[in-house]
Swiss-Prot record:
Region (Disordered): 187-212
Coiled-coil parts of chain: 236-341
Keyword Nucleus: yes
Family in the record: Belongs to the TAF7 family.
Self-association state and partner proteins as the record states: Component of the TFIID basal transcription factor complex, composed of TATA-box-binding protein TBP, and a number of TBP-associated factors (TAFs), including TAF1, TAF2, TAF3, TAF4, TAF5, TAF6, TAF7, TAF8, TAF9, TAF10, TAF11, TAF12 and TAF13. Part of a TFIID-containing RNA polymerase II pre-initiation complex that is composed of TBP and at least GTF2A1, GTF2A2, GTF2E1, GTF2E2, GTF2F1, GTF2H2, GTF2H3, GTF2H4, GTF2H5, GTF2B, TCEA1, ERCC2, ERCC3, TAF1, TAF2, TAF3, TAF4, TAF5, TAF6, TAF7, TAF8, TAF9, TAF10, TAF11, TAF12 and TAF13. Interacts with TAF1; the interaction is direct.
Organism whose genome encodes this protein: Mus musculus (Mouse)
Motif ([KR]-[STA]-K motif): 3-5
Keywords linked to the UniProt accession: Coiled coil, Nucleus, Phosphoprotein, Transcription, Transcription regulation, Ubl conjugation
UniProt name for this protein: Transcription initiation factor TFIID subunit 7
Disulfide bonds: none
GO biological process, one term: regulation of transcription by RNA polymerase II
Domain of life assignment: Eukaryota
PTM annotation (Phosphoserine): residues: S171, S200, S201, S213, S256
Ubl conjugation as UniProt keyword: yes
Gene name of the record: Taf7
Length: 341
């Protein structure tokens, strides 16, 4: 069976549940089941202008009625052969009729206020009066309080603000990739310098003491050699011996001074390379942390364009990490070569 495009779409019926006192409900049920022709004379419904109150007449007996909102939607089905069911409506309201109610309740006049928040709160309080806390069966008594939690408030952000924030983050990431920065704490630097001076002082004093003792030993050997040579060679000229002694002493002192200067230069070079290694380790750790945060961000983002952009930033961070690792390894090799000397 082909469907004609000109056919009007099927519309659901507008329905609600009518709840009556037991004696009146039995009268209406019998009239419906018997197929009474004049059902309109048996049952009539009249709603007031507010749309929430009305009058239900059963056998010309007026009952006060109130239209309430059910906790959830109930589907209404109908069947012809009791085998196939067709959905006819979604029922979300119920008209409750009572004998003791006021047929014409007083109309509440809303006080006009300039504050929109106050008006909104009053409307919300007014709607609460017509909220039905129970279901349509006995087991669902107080179902709204027992099973339904309060709706969580969500803070919605306008789409232009979101786009601006995304663009700002992307531009910040692009700038951060091409920027090299270093954090230096002045207090920590001073403490490190003081510790370095305190540590190097004993070493330098020990080196000088060792250097002085070495000079004394060398002088002692020279004097011993001279004394032995003077005993063996009594004919050597005294002036020549003194000149040779001064020359040898000067040579020894010059060699010791050169060695001391060379050691000081090596120590300064080692300290400089060690400082560069520490700085490079800090930069490498910072780059690795940024790469890790970028990977976490890529896992959370679902937009394909943003994911590609973040992936490009991550690739640049990986390349930067490789370069820093190479620089760190070269500095460590240079330091090892100096220490071996």
């Amino acid at each position: 069976m082909s469907k004609n495009k000109d056919d009007a779409p099927h519309e659901l019926e507008s329905q609600f549940i009518l709840r009556l006192p037991p004696e009146y409900a039995a009268t209406v049920r019998r009239a419906v089941q018997s197929g009474h022709v004049n059902l309109k004379d048996k049952l009539s419904i009249e709603l007031h202008p507010d749309g929430r109150h009305g009058i239900v007449r059963v056998d010309r007996v007026p009952l006060a009625a109130k239209l309430v909102d059910l906790p959830c939607v109930t589907e209404s089905l109908k069947t012809i052969d009791k085998k196939t069911f067709y959905k006819t409506a979604d029922i979300s309201q119920m008209l409750v009729a009572t004998v003791d109610g006021d047929l014409y309740p007083p109309v509440e006049e809303a006080a006009a206020t300039a504050d929109p928040k106050a008006n909104k709160k009053k409307d919300k309080d007014k709607e609460k009066k017509f909220v039905w806390n129970h279901g349509i069966t006995l087991p669902l008594k107080n179902v709204r309080k027992r099973r339904f939690r309060k709706t969580a408030k969500k803070k919605y952000i306008e789409s232009p603000d979101v786009e601006k924030e995304v663009k700002r983050l992307l531009s910040t990431d692009a700038e951060a990739v091409s920027t090299r920065w270093e954090i230096i704490a002045e207090d920590e630097t001073k403490e490190t310098e003081n510790q370095g001076l305190d540590i190097s002082s004993p070493g330098m004093s020990g080196h000088r003491q060792g250097h002085d003792s070495l000079e004394h030993d060398e002088l002692r050997e020279i004097f011993n050699d001279l004394s032995s040579s003077s005993e063996d060679e009594e004919d050597v000229n005294i002036l020549d011996t003194e000149e040779d002694l001064e020359r040898q002493l000067q040579d020894k002192l010059n060699e010791s001074d050169e060695q001391h200067q060379e050691n000081e230069g090596t120590n300064q070079l080692v300290m400089g390379i060690q400082k560069q290694i520490d700085n490079m380790k800090g930069k490498l750790q910072e780059t690795q942390d940024r790469a890790k945060r970028q990977e976490d961000l890529i896992m959370k983002v679902e937009n394909l364009a943003l994911k590609n952009r973040f992936q490009a930033v991550l690739d640049e961070l990986k390349q930067k990490e490789d370069r820093e690792k190479e620089q760190l390894s070269s500095l460590q090799e240079e330091l090892e070569s100096l220490l071996e000397k």
